[in-house]
Amino acid sequence: MSKKVENLMLGSWLTALTAMLGSLYFSEIRMYEPCTLCWYQRIIMYPLVLILFIGYLKRDVNVALYSLWFSLIGMFTSLYHYSIQKLPFLTDAAPACGRVPCTGQYINWFGFVTIPFLAFTAFVIIFICSLLIIREK
């Protein structure tokens, strides 16, 4: 395995780990209760931490195929979630999805950075790294 692929695998894992720790920080320390769509994004992100870590330790570039699909699904989920938070015509029509509304914004840094935006960014990084790993092998 080339150093470039090794670094991409490590970067993917660190991105997933940071996203997982960030979501746990928001829910367990800041006491933000996750909405249903947040839970879906967690369900997609958390296994990536383990999958990418094992792939990195075993030097198995084939995990990039799994992380590619997980991250693609996560990108669509978080993009939809971000859209119903930020686009007025979607916000008004957003269905109730549990005790916490999916349109709620616990954070809104710089007027556009919300938790689903952070998740989307992490999924995009993992997706790009996975694509690059697949192209290198």
Curated annotation (Swiss-Prot):
It is found in: Cell membrane. The chain crosses the membrane at residues 6-25, 40-59, 66-83, 111-133. Disulfide bonds join C35-C38, C97-C102. GO terms for biological process: protein folding. Keywords: Cell membrane, Chaperone, Disulfide bond, Electron transport, Membrane, Oxidoreductase, Redox-active center, Transmembrane, Transmembrane helix, Transport. It holds the Pfam family DsbB. GO terms for cellular component: plasma membrane. Its main location: membrane. It is a multi-pass membrane protein. It comes from the Bacteria. PANTHER family: DISULFIDE FORMATION PROTEIN-RELATED, SPBETA PROPHAGE-DERIVED DISULFIDE BOND FORMATION PROTEIN B. Belongs to the DsbB family. BdbC subfamily. This is Probable disulfide formation protein C. The gene is bdbC.
